């Protein structure tokens, strides 16, 4: 791709770009013709470009901007598209609606960066003539945002989705509950947010922290994301990482008589759910309300970092293990996840969970492996669908360098830009059957030390640009080409007001990642 021309410095990199002579100019009289099924993409085009360019882009059967949905188009899959820009007309085609939405983002990037910001005067809204054929390498290209440790307003989640969509990412993994906070309202259990949504402080700072979304806000977020081709996958942690839930409803724990606070520390809490039937009823009821809010085919239920000490010491848990024919109380973890997974499958959803080894979740689970790349292969060999999330390449809560002026971040070696871009969701040497089970990859941003949107964006960008580029383009990657395109792409980030970490010679160096393995 001719990245030396700024208008062709597209990110992520399209599959095939063939420049043509000439320019196509959008003007006040430029109209949009949306063929049947393409109306949503046309609406998005107007929503994104109208306020910033001042162009109406009115619908018309004679419009020179044509959006066409053709299910018979071969080789494009669910998200591929073809874009032809000529001097007199623009044609965007796809086999599925999401493909048109991806093409709309490419049109945005072909325009001057001012088309993303608004307020510019005297700009000619021109696109270079070009032919683009583009299909993603992986169907899962995600970003996980932890709003349990530090709550973020729903208005910022809308912006987060907008930035994801610009980079053709398609799954927002929303981490809604943890030991330190519960952010989703559950009508059947109102104390989850009235009590579990508040903690006295973070570590020893003495500053209370609170927050919860309304169901209307979450429905609005899902709708906003869907209009941009992004699925919101909720995560409700269980059977560990549940201290906030136990603060609200102590009877769900292994010591019902004990009164707990919402946890104020970070790390792994040894307080976990009990395994009595009331706990399973609670989980099923919560998940029913989750499924009512989130149409995502995947529902994440956490599952990792669950100490079994309380079960080993609990007569009730030992009795449950014996009654279920388990060898030891520690085996209750797999039993618990199996019960929850079966419930989600019965409701037409795909249970998803974190895996510490790749082999501990029931077979119906889609597995996110984070500790070691080899665990992804273990899970694939067991027949799981896999989303690779190796912490040394996808955890954006680690610093981007060892520079002393970096913002506070998770303890551990840095995860530099190069480590993110060179991470292949399907490492070389995997067999075809193993590789076919990898859905893709995603970034993670745990927010123990990330308190504000400014810090979120500093830690996220430009590293999320790197992950988006590799997840969409696949292959062995082109670091030098990515760096060249990224230099131009920062003008778009500037136009959008993204508070990204500035590019430096050091950050663009091809250095290897560290090897430490701190907890998530």
Model-predicted regions and their roles:
Residues 351-365, 370-520:
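Flexible, acidic glycine-rich loops studded with aromatic residues
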Residues 245-251, 255, 260-364, 370-382:
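Active-site neighborhood of glycoside hydrolase catalytic domains
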Residues 2-138, 455, 467, 471-497, ...:
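Contiguous, structured surface segment used for ligand recognition
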Residues 44, 99, 156-159, 213-220, ...:
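Generic recognition of stable, solvent-exposed alpha-helical segments in well-folded globular domains
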Residues 76-270, 275-280, 284, 288-298, ...:
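Feature activates predominantly on carbohydrate-active enzymes
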Residues 55, 169, 228-230, 349, ...:
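Short glycine/serine/threonine/alanine-rich loop segments
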Residues 40-41, 151-153, 179-185, 239-245, ...:
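Flexible loop/turn segments at secondary-structure boundaries
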């Amino acid at each position: 791709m001719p990245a030396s021309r700024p208008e062709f410095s597209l990110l992520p990199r399209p599959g095939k770009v063939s420049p043509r002579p000439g320019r196509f100019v959008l003007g006040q009289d430029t109209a949009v013709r949306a063929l049947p099924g393409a109306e949503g993409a046309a609406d998005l085009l107007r929503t994104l470009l109208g306020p910033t360019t001042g162009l109406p882009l009115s619908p018309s059967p004679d419009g020179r901007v044509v959006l066409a949905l053709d299910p018979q188009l071969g080789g494009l899959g669910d998200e591929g598209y073809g874009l032809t820009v000529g001097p007199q007309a623009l044609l965007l085609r796809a086999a599925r609606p999401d493909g048109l939405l991806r093409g709309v983002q490419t049109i945005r990037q072909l325009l001057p960066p001012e088309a993303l910001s608004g307020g510019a005067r005297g700009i000619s809204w021109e696109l270079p003539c070009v032919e683009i054929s583009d299909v993603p390498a992986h169907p899962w290209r995600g970003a996980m945002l932890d709003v349990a440790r530090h709550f973020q307003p729903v208005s910022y989640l809308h912006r987060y989705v907008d930035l994801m969509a610009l980079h053709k990412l398609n799954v927002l993994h929303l981490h809604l509950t943890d030991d330190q906070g519960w952010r989703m309202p559950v009508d059947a259990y109102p104390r989850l947010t009235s009590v579990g949504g508040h903690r006295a402080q973070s570590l020893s700072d003495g500053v209370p922290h609170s927050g919860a979304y309304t169901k209307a806000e979450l429905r609005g977020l899902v709708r906003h994301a869907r209009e941009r081709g992004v699925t919101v996958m909720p995560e409700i942690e269980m059977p560990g990482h549940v201290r906030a839930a136990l603060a609200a409803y102590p009877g769900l724990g292994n010591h019902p008589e004990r009164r707990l606070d919402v946890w104020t520390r970070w790390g792994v809490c040894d307080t976990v759910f009990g395994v009595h039937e009331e706990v399973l009823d609670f989980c099923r009821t919560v998940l029913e309300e989750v499924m009512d809010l989130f149409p995502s085919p995947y529902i994440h239920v956490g599952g990792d970092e669950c100490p079994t000490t309380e079960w080993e010491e609990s007569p009730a848990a030992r009795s449950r293990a014996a009654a279920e024919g388990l060898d030891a109380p520690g085996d209750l973890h797999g039993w618990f996840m199996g019960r929850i997974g079966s419930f989600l499958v019965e409701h037409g959803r795909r249970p998803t969970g974190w895996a510490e080894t790749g082999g501990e979740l029931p077979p119906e689970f889609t597995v996110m492996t984070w500790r070691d790349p080899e665990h992804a292969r273990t899970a694939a060999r067991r027949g799981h669908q896999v989303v690779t999330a190796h912490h040394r390449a996808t955890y954006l809560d680690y610093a981007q360098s060892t520079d002393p002026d970096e913002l506070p971040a998770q303890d551990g070696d840095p995860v530099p830009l190069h480590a993110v871009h060179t991470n292949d969701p399907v490492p070389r040497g995997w067999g075809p059957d193993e590789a076919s089970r990898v859905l893709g990859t995603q970034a993670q941003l745990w927010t123990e030390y990330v308190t504000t949107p400014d810090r979120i964006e500093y830690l996220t960008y430009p590293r999320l640009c790197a992950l988006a580029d590799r997840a969409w383009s696949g292959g062995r990657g082109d670091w030098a080409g990515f760096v060249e395109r990224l230099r131009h792409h920062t003008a778009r980030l500037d136009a959008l007001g993204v508070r990204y970490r500035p590019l430096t010679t050091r950050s663009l160096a091809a250095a290897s990642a560290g090897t430490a393995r701190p907890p998530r």
